[in-house]
Amino acid sequence: MTLPYNTTADASDPVTLSRYNMIEQQIRPWNVLDTDVLDLLNVVRREDFVPPAYRGMAFMDMEIPLNPSAEEAQRLGQCMLAPRVEARLLQDLQVKPTDRVLEIGSGSGYMAALLAHRAEHVVTLEIVPDLVEFARENLLSAGIANVTVRQGDGARDAIPDGPFDVIVLSGSVHEVPQNLLALLREGG
């Protein structure tokens, strides 16, 4: 078997094979066909952004808890999105190299890392202090320098870094907060 896209990874490596299977069996069937996105999923190592207790699940088609305890995870609902959802978001956002991006809900920093490869700069906001630090550490370890991680509540706090070309909410809301809409550049 040879790996498609622009990877030089060894296909006999179990992690590389798991990543390949994730792309072929979860992401492509979800109509994510943008080769730049597929290449990026080979380059940004998802497993490095998953909490150590869940690394074995890094490529599974599921949301991965980001909180240390199941009780805290249920209370806060903090999780990594399923890989197919992350890939579809990345494809549909059509981020350009000149874009400034705001992400609400940093989590582990993985989505910010993906966005950073496509954008000029990413500002990511996280409400949970431990996850702010986790995202910062992960992004630093991955060598990603064009992301600013801030602690705050995207629905309530003032965000001084706008305007933005793209705003991503890595969670659910009943209604898009007006303060976020005000930060979106015209045409964004």
State where each predicted segment sits:
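Conserved nucleotide-cofactor-binding alpha/beta core module
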Residues: L90-G188
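Short, composition-biased local secondary-structure segments
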Residues: M1-T2, G107
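Class I SAM-dependent transferase core
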Residues: T2-L102, R118, L131-S141
